[in-house]
Amino acid sequence: MFFTISTHKMSSIADRNDGSIFDGLVEEDDKDKAKRVSRNKSEKKRRDQFNVLIKELGSMLPGNARKMDKSTVLQKSIDFLRKHKEITAQSDASEIRQDWKPTFLSNEEFTQLMLEALDGFFLAIMTDGNIIYVSESITPLLEHLPSDLVDQSVFNFIPEGEHSEIYKILSSHLLESDSLTPEYLKSKNQLEFCCHMLRGTIDPKEQPTYEYVKFIGNFKCLNNVPNSAHNGFEGTIQRSHRPSYEDKVCFVATVRLATPQFIKEMCTVEEPNEEFTSRHSLEWKFLFLDHRAPPIIGYLPFEVLGTSGYDYYHVDDLDNLAKCHEHLMQYGKGKSCYYRFLTKGQQWIWLQTHYYITYHQWNSRPEFIVCTHTVVSYAEVRAERRRELGIEESLPEITGDKSQDSGSDNHINTVSLKEALERFDTSPTPSASSRSSRKSSHTAVSDHSSTPTKMTVDTSTPPRQSLSGHEKTAQRRSSLSSQSLSSQSLGQPVAQPTMSQPSTLQLQSGMSQPVFQFSAQLGAMQHLKDQLEQRTRMIEANIHRQQEELRKIQEQLQIVHGQGLQMFLQQSASGLNFGSVQLASGNSSNVQQLTPINMQGQVVQTNQTQSGMSTGHISAPHMIQQQSLQSTATQHNQQNVLSGHTQQSSLASQSQNTVSAPLYNTMVISQPTTGNVVQVPSSLPQNNNQNAAAVTTFTQDRQIRFSQGQQLVTKLVTAPVACGAVMVPSTMFMGQVVTAYPTFAAQQQQPQTLSITQQQQQSQQDQQQQQLTTAQQPAQQQLTQHPQQFLQTSRLLHGNQSAQLILSAAFPLQQSTFTQSHHQQHQSQQQQQLVRHRTDKMTDPSKAQPQ
């Protein structure tokens, strides 16, 4: 029983132990599982973070855009860090010491300032003489733009007599190929030499001038420079004789002037469109300067106020500026030429000014001149002046390395030397013909040692400065065989490559220069032709406008003058008195004389009478050719003012057409209180074959006299004429020629003499007044029918004979030509009408006047 109980207790204890063990195992498993889960989470988090960092690092590394594995990313990162460490070490080694460099200046800025202070510039030259970099400080020193020298041979800018020496210096490392290692290139290779360099000019045809300069530099090793073409000299020196690093060496030098310049042009313009405003008096003294001027010119406003602007201008620009200022004073506004302004730092800066004159608002007097000055670069100035000279200048060449720079506008000359060398490492190498063609122009000099610092030579071929597009294309076509042939023909040895180069290039430039000069002359002639044609069109337009204005003024004067003459005729009609006219006969004789008379710019000339008729007639000659052609209008504009028995001494001028009328000159023949005598000698033949002439003269007392012949002259005294003014029109274009001629021919059986005198009897004036009334009626009819006026005396008939004294003055309202026959036929019809009228009057005995 006891055994049974104990056995039961033992079994219960064993079961209890097994359960506890199982529970313990379960608890341990749960703990391990929790630990694994926690560990897995932490591992996953770490891996995720590592992947994110690798991905971010891969995105920052340069290279392909493809996905890289972790090891590649880490490897490139290590390489980048190593390279960065090396560059940092080199920068620290080349860093300028802070004890003599200001902290606010970068290395590039400090280097530029030092070059300007030392009158020097940087120059990087390959061993074959090709220039790969030049700093901008060359512009104020030698007046070259950096683009003029980049990618050209240095031998183009050095006298020919110094080529061999410079070539030996640049190729000196070839002779030391054993000792010249990359380590040597980094340390003990400093080189100094002196030579002459060509100065730049605006006109390439000017006489070349050379400046004496000093080169101080050393050879630099370029790691990734592609193999050079050596400008066509591969056949001269075998490739196997050259060291492997020859093509990767360039000569970097600082070029300084032997004679320093105290005043230089500002070489760099940070912002070419910078401008400032100033105000000047009429004497060109500063009155105002705005706040933008001090950073540009260096002067504060109080430093320039009251001083003349001419104190700051370059002496070579004074003449052009004076002409511009004269233009300003004449037109009130304008634009100046390019000129140099002296800054406070003793540098010349190029400016262009727009100015205008301001006037007082009350009295309109000029007060002062407002100027807006704009900063311009030397490249713009040179391009503009070369265009004025008819020289085509191509734009600065953009190298291939710049085209690879996306969005960059900086040229190779605006970067540092280090960047230029790096760009040259990746830039494509020009072909042999292209590289050789750029060394095309050379100028022969007599003796480079004639002057120590500056040398002027007289040559027929101008030096090479810049190449236009068509020149470079023509020169690139030159082959290497032509270069070697020309070098042999000129006697240059093959062992000296660069000595054969100038001769080759001189021939090439001689061939391309006539084409360039011809194109430049053709462009200049075309430009001049366009300017002349434009100026001609402007002058013609002004002439047409002035002619139109003159025509309108003449029409107005004609209208006013016609109205005044009508009133004058009405007033003078009441004062006319007529006397009797007696015709007497005399012996016949021939009087033939031509007497020219000058009468206020007009010529009055007597002509011979035809068929024995004594006639005095002053009229416009229809044999003179006039310039304009309107004969019909002229014939219808003629008008005869006829008197009854005596001469009516007044002239009416009126035109019904709208043609251009000339200005009139008035000739006044005054009548004294005594009787005015008009003598008409008449010597008429008995037969039809003899002719007689009436000679008309004017005396100083303004009397009209006909010179006496050998026969009897009878005198008749007529009543005084109230109006003694004879108005003779004259044209403003040409002097009017008036000739006396007979209107019609009639045979005279008896000589006749007409004399007009003045009567004083008051009783006869009443009868003459009645005659005036009857005589004016046909005259008024003729006046309304014919606008052009003639002054004629009355014709008196005695039996079947007739005599006439006609004084006519033609009004040249239109310059025209007309035939004599048509004019005489028109006058003959008028004379016949007058004959009928006078015959009726003479038959009336109450109208007769006793002698």
UniProtKB/Swiss-Prot annotation:
Subcellular localization: Cytoplasm; Nucleus; Cytoplasm, Cytosol
Gene3D superfamilies tied to this protein: Helix-loop-helix DNA-binding domain, PAS domain
Record domain PAC: where: 336-379
Site residues, Interaction with E-box DNA: 39, 43, 47
Annotated stretches, region: Disordered: 420-508, 627-655, 817-851
Single Gene Ontology MF annotation: DNA binding
GO cellular component term, pick one: nucleus
Pfam families: HLH, PAS, PAS_11
GO biological process: circadian regulation of gene expression; DNA damage response; protein acetylation; response to redox state
Residue span(s) of domain bHLH: 34-84
PANTHER family assigned to the protein according to its UniProt record, in alphabetical order: CIRCADIAN LOCOMOTER OUTPUT CYCLES PROTEIN KAPUT
Protein name (record): Circadian locomoter output cycles protein kaput
Species per Swiss-Prot/TrEMBL record: Tyto alba (Barn owl)
